[in-house]
Amino acid sequence: MGVQKRQWIRRSFKWLAFVLLLVAAMGFTFEEIGRWQDRQHRFRIGRAVDVGGRSLNIDCSGEGSPTVVLESGGGGYGGYQWRVVQEGIAKFTRVCWYDRAGEGWSDPAPSARTSSSVVDDLHELLKRAPLEGPLVLVGHSNGGEYVRIFTARFPDEVAGAVLVDSTHPEQQEPPFMLSPVNRLPKLAREFLCSAMPLAQRLGTIRLLMRNAPVDVPPQFQSERDGVTLALRNQRVKGVETEMTQGCAATEGGAEKPDRGSGNPEVDQAAQISGRLGDRPLIVLTAGQYWKPDDPVAAREIANFHETWIHQLQPELSRLSTRGQQIIVDTSDHSIPEHAPEAIVTAVSQVVLAVRGLQNEVTPTAGTVTAGGNDLD
C-alpha cells in the first residue's frame, strides 16, 4: 500500500471520528435541552404523591364507594388516556387514574420496573394519597395483567374488576403483530438492549418521538396545548421506561417473547396470580381489529381474532364465578378512546354489584355498541 493511500485512509478515519463525535455532541446537547425543557414545563393533570423519595402522579374525581382505579395499557402514554372514562365514572363514584413510574407525570423507578414493583407502587400510592377501599380495578391491555397481580397480592382490598381487551398471558399472536423489536433476530435485539442507554443519552429516542401524536378529547380542548407538550415530552420517558423493563425481562434481548404482552416476567406473574373468586368481573372484548392489505396477513389476523374473542377472552371471564364477557362491536383494541361509554357502563354494573344493589352484573345480549350513548 502506497504512502499516499495510507495517509488518505488515516485522514478519512480522522474525519469519520470527528463527524461521529460531532453528531454525538449534538445528540447529547439535544437531549439535555429536552430534559431541561421537561423540567421547566409545569403543566400537570393530577397531583404528585410522595411514595418514598420519589413521586407518582394521580388524578381523582367523584365521590362515593367503592373507589375505581384505572390501570393503563402499554405504549408509554401513562394514565391520561382515561380522561373521558373518568368523567363518566365520576358521576356515580370515586375514580382515579395514575401514571406508573417513569410514565406521564410520575418520577422514574429507581431500577428497571417489574410486575412486583408496579403493583407495590400502586399500593403505596393509594395508601399515601390516601384512598380507602374497597377497590374496583379497571385494566386495559397489559394493564389487565397488573389488575390480576395486584388482586393476588392484596386480595382483601379488591372487590371487583373490569378487564378492557386485556392481555392473556398465553396469547400467541401472528409474527407480524408482534412489536418491531420482537420481530428482530436475537443478535439485533441484544444490540438494541445494550445500546439503549447510549441512545437515551444521545437523544435518539427523543428525536424519534418528537412528533408522536397526542389525542386530547374534544371536551378537554382548554388543556390541549399544555397536555400536548407535556405528554409528547413525557412519552420519551415512558417509552424508555418500557424498553428498559422489557430488556430486563428478556435477559437483555436474548429471549424472544412471542406470547402474552411481550414481557415474560409480567405474563408469568399474571399466569400464577390465580383466580378472582366470586368478585364481580366484566371482560370487555374489542369486536374490531386491524385489517392489513396483505391477504395472507389479513387471514392470519382474522383467525387470531376469532381465537381472541371465542377462546382467550372467555377464559379471562371465567377467572371469577361472577364473570361476564361483553363484546364491544364498534371498537378495536383502543376501547378507552373509541368506546369509553362501554367501559363506564361496565364499571357501573360492577360498582352496583359491589354495593350489593344487585347480586350479579346485569346480563346483556353479549354486545355493547360504542358511540351515541349519553353518560349523563
Q: Where in the sequence are the language-model features?
A:
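Active-site loop/oxyanion-hole signature of alpha/beta-hydrolase fold enzymes
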Residues: 61, 97-138
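Hydrophobic membrane-insertion alpha-helices, especially the h-region
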Residues: 14-29
